[in-house]
């Protein structure tokens, strides 16, 4: 059995829209624009949640992962978030790290990939502690669950170093993407662009929720559609029989 370390109290430390399972599991799941929290935690993940922003959102993901030395895999799945491109940005962070002065994620395709609250040491710890498993744009719970099982089977054991705690200098306003970034003078991103991206993100989240509701209603919708169709056919047949009877008289 793989060696494990005691998990710090109140883990995960950073708040978010996630579900928590076995905290000694080696797998953390980032489901991007999809919400499959309960299913993937049930499949064996230590933590599972969506990731909608390539700045504060990624900061929280990194902080929660490096504060649990048992996590050795970050499985990225679900639908990519358009505009923010959070999945590819996590991969860029893992592969390239950050610009120490600008605090930007090197090579990120996202619009605002700034991680103001993450020290270089935290990013380096993230890079050393975990391996990235990429299943971007895959929403098949069965396939993702199988990959979780595979990671658990190959668990290398807890990372050698103890949990690393990242303190966020966070105020209520910093929950909004507009306020969380400090731009350099040569930045080409203006306030209007950021606000538009936030609107786009909200629309994307609403679309995902609508898709989930639609999938749940699919069976009942089909049932009622078939029922209505049967009533219409019965009504037409009744009219035909009445016409035949009347003509016979």
From Swiss-Prot:
Residues 1-227 are cytoplasmic. Residues 249 are extracellular. It catalyses: 5-methyl-5,6,7,8-tetrahydromethanopterin + coenzyme M + 2 Na(+)(in) = 5,6,7,8-tetrahydromethanopterin + methyl-coenzyme M + 2 Na(+)(out). The chain crosses the membrane at residues 228-248. Part of a complex that catalyzes the formation of methyl-coenzyme M and tetrahydromethanopterin from coenzyme M and methyl-tetrahydromethanopterin. This is an energy-conserving, sodium-ion translocating step. The gene is mtrA. One of its GO terms (biological process) is methanogenesis, from carbon dioxide. Belongs to the MtrA family. Its main location: membrane. Its cofactor is 5-hydroxybenzimidazolylcob(I)amide. Keywords: Cell membrane, Cobalt, Membrane, Methanogenesis, Methyltransferase, One-carbon metabolism, Transferase, Translocase, Transmembrane, Transmembrane helix. It is found in: Cell membrane. It is an enzyme of class 7 (translocase). Binds 1 5-hydroxybenzimidazolylcobamide group. The complex is composed of 8 subunits; MtrA, MtrB, MtrC, MtrD, MtrE, MtrF, MtrG and MtrH. 5-hydroxybenzimidazolylcob(I)amide binds at residue 84. One of its GO terms (cellular component) is plasma membrane. It holds the Pfam family MtrA. GO terms for molecular function: cobalt ion binding; tetrahydromethanopterin S-methyltransferase activity. It comes from Methanosphaera stadtmanae (strain ATCC 43021 / DSM 3091 / JCM 11832 / MCB-3). This is Tetrahydromethanopterin S-methyltransferase subunit A. Pathway: One-carbon metabolism; methanogenesis from CO(2); methyl-coenzyme M from 5,10-methylene-5,6,7,8-tetrahydromethanopterin: step 2/2. It is a single-pass membrane protein.
């Amino acid at each position: 059995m793989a060696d494990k370390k005691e998990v710090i109290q109140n883990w995960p430390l950073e708040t978010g829209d996630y579900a928590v399972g076995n905290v000694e599991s080696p797998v953390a799941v980032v489901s991007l624009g999809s919400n499959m929290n309960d299913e993937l935690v049930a499949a064996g993940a230590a933590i599972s949640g969506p990731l909608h922003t390539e700045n504060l959102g990624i900061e929280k993901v990194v902080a929660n992962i490096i504060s649990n030395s048992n996590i050795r895999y970050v499985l990225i799945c679900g639908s990519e978030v358009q505009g923010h491109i959070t999945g590819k940005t996590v991969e860029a962070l893992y592969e390239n790290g950050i610009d120490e002065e600008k605090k930007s994620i090197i090579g990120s395709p996202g619009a605002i990939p700034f991680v103001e609250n993450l020290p270089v040491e935290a990013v380096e710890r993230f890079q050393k502690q975990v391996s990235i498993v990429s299943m971007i744009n895959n929403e098949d719970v069965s396939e993702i669950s199988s990959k979780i099982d595979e990671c658990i089977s190959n668990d290398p054991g807890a990372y050698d170093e103890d949990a690393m705690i990242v303190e966020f200098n966070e105020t209520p306003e910093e929950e909004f993407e507009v306020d969380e970034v400090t731009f350099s003078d040569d930045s080409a991103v203006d306030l209007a662009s950021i606000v538009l991206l936030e609107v786009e993100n909200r629309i994307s989240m609403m679309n995902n929720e609508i898709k989930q509701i639609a999938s749940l209603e699919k069976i009942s919708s089909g049932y009622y559609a078939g029922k209505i169709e049967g009533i219409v056919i019965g009504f037409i047949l009744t009219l035909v029989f009445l016409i035949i009877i009347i003509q016979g008289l």
